[in-house]
């Protein structure tokens, strides 16, 4: 008898305790560490949260897929520089060219832009294929040119296949290689190949081609300026060869004309570009 | 008798196991969570189900030094509407899901990588400055079209821009740069409360 009274008493005690403590004290005591961010982070590292756990108290988080490679949003261009493209083609041809010392080695803006474009591409869905698969890699411009050169094709042939591929959007083209007519300036690419190959072989650099058509010399009291009017078929790379003898200098012209050029590939027929003297 | 006690404790334990798992912290009275699909990805926004949660760490601070962390205006530029959490969620559900809008996280990548609003795209304010030679590429990706050397934004995306909060000028700078680049103010909205307010409501974040 005594035992059952004691048992009932203990039960009543537990029941009271339960009723008193229950509201506001969920079984899983939560500490300050349970802040939304902290949990959010943990969840996506661990992957999808099972429904049971999610329904307890967790903010459900859909884990993001891995970042896709920077997409080529513009059909014609990407942010690669001529020097890289050239080096890749020469490497593809088996010519061992020492990497060009790039004056603009670190280009944080380029990297930043590439990751921005990748992010926008993922959201707008233009680059991400269904199911989150990474898009098939483009045939590279370098591969096309290497193959054509190995086959001994003519410059005109290379020009045609490169432009067809660029228009179909299957390759991307580096900065400064798009002409005012919107074509790919294959001649400049081929020139750049010769230039680098000569440099690698220890031969002197090619002289500037230096045609004077479209060039004006302006002077005022303080300075002497060269201005070049963009003609049909000009690319920034071609203009750089014309004045400096090197494709790599196209960035000098671009930087001097930032007020009229929104990108190195945005040159227009009739645009008047300042051609600065090279320092030193 | 022992068995009675054990049974009673058992009943108690069973009672204890059931309660308090139903959602009680909704977004609004009739919306517990928001689910939307962008491309191939599905996102869900809900709130932490802990009535006692408080802000922790970086976002619990109230008095960062100004400068550099100064209180930002409600209206950054004429025509740029300030919005709150419900408008951000509605924007994600309708415009972003339909592909006509982009939620822009204007913070630098190191902030973004610590957690962002679901489906936000990181477009750091620095990438939108006129000093970025590749700015035109970003504007094109946002839907701007170049006609005769002029950027036109008729087909461009509607944007909602946010940063860490009202004490953070990264969104202000991003919006100012966008307008300088020609983006119409009427197509930009500012979630001024930013991540601080978002977290203050215990709303979901994702790791990019």
Please provide the spans of the model-predicted regions:
Chain B
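Bacterial N-terminal signal peptides that target proteins for export
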Residues: 1-7
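C-terminal segment of classical bacterial N-terminal signal peptides
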Residues: 12-21
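Flexible, polar/low-complexity N-terminal or interdomain linker segments that lie immediately upstream
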Residues: 21-114
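Phosphate/oxyanion-binding active-site loops and adjacent basic polyanion-contact surfaces
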Residues: 77-84, 128-135, 167-170
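Mid-length scaffold segments of soluble, non-membrane domains
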Residues: 93-157
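Solvent-exposed loop/turn segments at secondary-structure junctions
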Residues: 108-112, 127-130, 165-169, 194-198
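Catalytic cysteine-centered active loop of the rhodanese-like fold, especially the PTP/DSP P-loop
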Residues: 139-197
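Active-site neighborhoods of enzymes that stabilize oxyanions during catalysis
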Residues: 201-208
